[in-house]
Amino acid sequence: MQIFVKTLTGKTITLEVEPSDTIENVKAKIQDKEGIPPDQQRLIFAGKQLEDGRTLSDYNIQKESTLHLVLRLRGGMQIFVKTLTGKTITLEVEPSDTIENVKAKIQDKEGIPPDQQRLIFAGKQLEDGRTLSDYNIQKESTLHLVLRLRGGMQIFVKTLTGKTITLEVEPSDTIENVKAKIQDKEGIPPDQQRLIFAGKQLEDGRTLSDYNIQKESTLHLVLRLRGGC
């Protein structure tokens, strides 16, 4: 059958393959056509990086499927992933790796399914389809891994005008995450938000569970006046 391989330069290569061909075989065919050594090739299909020992049929790659070829930067880089238990995992990655790829590597090392992983860097939750370089994650950067509790929960946020906003959250969400969700719904920048629960102002770096905020709790939103303290 024929498949297509699209490079980052936009060039498309046509290959004659069999469903039983391994990814390694495919890389050899690409080398024959383009002169790129297999160890510098990374093949992506449906957002997944393909492993050398697996076959096209393992990945359900059928005739006229398009694979994406990304060149592996020599050497790649190491990053660290710190879990809530304090354990630090070291990963070999490339700047062009997607967050989804990184979660797959964490699954390989730790057995945690990607859909239960949330990765945080510089206070931001990282989105699956974006790459490390999109977030300016460089060698020896540290990401934080938070486990997503299945199902999450609803909380309410009441504004001074009396309006109540409903949010879908997880106990492990930081206050910063909650402010980002409020910004998404209401357009209020996080730096203008102050959140109050049980008479306490909530700090950005802490989580809902730190403050014992449970399902259907109500937070109060006070707007911070520009230039105020």
From Swiss-Prot:
The modification ADP-ribosylglycine is found at residue 76. Changing residue 74 to G: No effect on ADP-ribosylation. Pfam families: ubiquitin. One of its GO terms (cellular component) is neuron projection. The modification (Microbial infection) ADP-ribosylthreonine is found at residue 66. GO terms for biological process: energy homeostasis; fat pad development; female gonad development; female meiosis I; hypothalamus gonadotrophin-releasing hormone neuron development; male meiosis I; mitochondrion transport along microtubule; modification-dependent protein catabolic process. This is Polyubiquitin-B. It comes from Homo sapiens. The gene is UBB.
